[in-house]
């Protein structure tokens, strides 16, 4: 299977929904059974990294937006359904916060996709993505932890150093 056809098989709204559904369940089970993984997957930084990867590897801005929304909504729904089934404790403010995050994720995906385009504006966007990841760890979760440095280091590498091949030929419906 060619790399681009493999990418389109993996990066489409249905597969992203399924991935989000599975990661939502996994994140909740990590909270229960694997405290360290639960801690990592409760942080916004890991979801910023995953969302950025989905967006930048999507073939177009429109595809990035269409891929990230079902991913985030799937993750959100199954996380809280699993939390309810397992009698988990969670606050309404967390539900509201993550719902807002999921609802604005297509806009964030649009800009994340743009971060890999040439030019100064793309570097400003990339810097903003990393800054939001760092600041969210400090403001929402008190401090930067070792895994935050690893996640943010991965973001820096992906956004500033990793080369992404994008096709020059794009279909109108997918731009």
State what each model feature region is.
Residues 1-68:
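N-terminal topogenic module of multi-pass integral membrane proteins
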Residues 2-9, 13, 98-121:
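Short helix-perturbing small/polar motifs within transmembrane alpha-helices
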Residues 3-9, 161-174:
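Membrane-interface capping segments at transmembrane-helix boundaries
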Residues 20-28, 72-82, 129-140:
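Aromatic-anchored segments of alpha-helical transmembrane domains
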Residues 47-56, 101-113, 152-162:
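Hydrophobic cores of alpha-helical transmembrane segments in multi-pass inner/ER membrane proteins
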Residues 66-76, 123-133, 172-175:
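Central hydrophobic cores of alpha-helical transmembrane segments
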Residues 98, 142-155:
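Loop-to-transmembrane alpha-helix initiation sites
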Residues 114-122, 134-148, 161-166:
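Membrane-helix boundary connector in multi-pass membrane proteins
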